[in-house]
Structure formats: C-alpha cells, structure tokens
Amino acid sequence: ANQFQAYQATRYVDTSIPHIPVTAYGLKENGYATIATTNWLPYSWSINNVAFAEVMHTALSYFQAGRADAGYKLLKSSVLDGMYLGDSPGNFGQISFYDAARGVCFRDFGEPIGVASRVLIQGLFGILPDALNQQIILRPGFPDDWDKASVSTPDISYRFTRKENTDTYHITQRFQTPLHPVLHVNARKEKIRSVKVNGVPATWQSIESAHGYPLLSIQAEGTSSTTITIEWEVAPLHTLAVQEPVISSNGKLA
C-alpha cells in the first residue's frame, strides 16, 4: 500500500470500527477511547473483542500511515485501559474489561507486551532499521506539544529537544558498522531557515507521498554520533479539519 492507501485504511477504522470511551473517576476527559477488533455480530470468541494486542497493532498502523496524533491517542488510551484502570497494574493482560463478553482475562500476557514494545520503538520513536540499504530511518511520532523525548536501546539511542524554533536530534549508534541516519519529520512551520548535520549546513528533500503535513527527509553520514538541527521560521502550519461526507438515501454523495 502507498501512504494514501494506508491513510484510507485508518479512516475506515475511524468511521466503521466501534470506539469505546476510556473513562474513570479522576481521569480528565480528553477523548480517550479504545476500539473493538471488528463490528461483527453476533458475538463469537476471537471475532469481536477488545484485545490489547489488536488495539496496539492498530495504533502502530496509525503511526505507519503518518497519523501519529491518532496513533499516540490510541496508544495512550490502551495504556490507561490496561495498566492503570484494569486488573494488570503496570502491565498488560489479554482482554480489556471493556470487552462485554469476556472482560479482563489473563495477566502479564506476552502478546500485547511485545506489540506495545513495537509501537513504542517503531511507532512513537519511529526507529526503523534498514541495514540491507545501510540506513536507519527515524520517523518520530511525538505529539505536537512535546518539547523533549529520549529513548535508549542496545543498538541506538536518540534524544529530541525543542527550544522555540529549533529542533535538535542527538543520535548515538552502537552497530558494528554505523548506518546512515535518515530523519523523516513533519514540517511544523511555513519555512525552514536552516538544516545542519554536526554543525555543518545540510540539504533536505520533500517526500511527495506525504499527507496531512509536508514531510522532510534529512540524510547524514553513518557515524557513531550524529546531531541534526532544524531551525524553523514564519507561521506554524495547520491542517484543515476533517469534514465527514454526507451520503444521501440513494447512496451517493450529497
């Protein structure tokens, strides 16, 4: 699938898959919601559930489709559901208590734990090794209001900081042969003042298949330590609100 087809698939989830509000006493209302695996009825086991692994896979799909905001909201909703409000504090079970047929089942369940780890590394932090092509793609999926984040794995660490109009990414590799870091980031303002790699002016490219926001690609040489700095200027970019289509009784767009 291309990026727009991936976007369309996630829009199907938005409009056709049941969303269940995640609420609790003392939890600030912020649109948190988990999802069912399907809208299939009548109920049968393993066809229509509220299962943590499937929810996390869907969150990863949002990140992969370039919809990091929706991916993060679903990720956080599921973490609140399982780790804080469910019967597996600080961990994941198999099924959410929002599942009407089964409710909470099992504790410390390996399947959602593994998928949640993948969402964190490949989705939220966007670490995508591509050693066959001697590169490692970093496609951060941080919420817009984050001004710092960091992650450390056995093979790579990186730290993101934002100060006013400047975004900085410090990348440290521990591969036997360092890969070329390729940073993919959404344009957050109307103009780029400068891009630097290890303090030296660098070029950037626009990825044509992007949607929602312009997507920039910045490539660096494969070294054990890399610092990429992006300085923005002019006004912030904003996306248009999604307007749901109106379907007439004959099945055509009104």
Identify the meaning behind each predicted range:
Residues 1-50, 83-85, 94-98, 150:
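Extended glycan-interaction surfaces of carbohydrate-active proteins
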